[in-house]
């Protein structure tokens, strides 16, 4: 990479003869460690977007583009680094948010499902599984440096993981033309933690009538392994669903909780345009 183009370096012949070929102009690399190789090609973060190369350069459509690049400390772009999480078909990048001098956020792309996710986490280096059984990452917290083992365990330090959540982007209910009455919804949740049938999380339904409005919380419901459905009486054009840790529960009940989210189904009924 240069500041304005991508080149390919190929071996031509002995003893040490290589050829430099222009691959694509108008692309760059935001930082020296912002490229990552994956089973489906090379991915990298540019100063204004994301790209992949598998014989040709292809821009990646990104549904969270504004979230990342409108909140990026460009003066700390050299700290951006890419990572591979092969177990979950993901590549991603850690970066410094606006106003932060250290890495504080990440963006992830699933190259099989073609979906994006965002989050907040402080990591400074990443080694995917292979040499070790699980991914390892370096991080800094409370004045100390740590090596974290990822994708294993839930709260190995004996402290519950509070403020944990997965939240969807807001989506149109139906086509968004008419109001829809949400009678109930059926979350697809699999609890994977160590505390068995006592595991609980909160399911939050948010809604709004018009795109320019803020999402408001319509309902928060506790969800366990025995919960089959959640009845509601929400009316809106757009909605979002959030799954979060039950931080109000006793400490013992919050330990060993883990969950995986599938596709949530909504029971809808048209409810007019006004």
Regions found by a protein language model. Name each.
Residues 1-24:
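Surface-exposed extracellular loop regions of Gram-negative outer-membrane beta-barrel proteins
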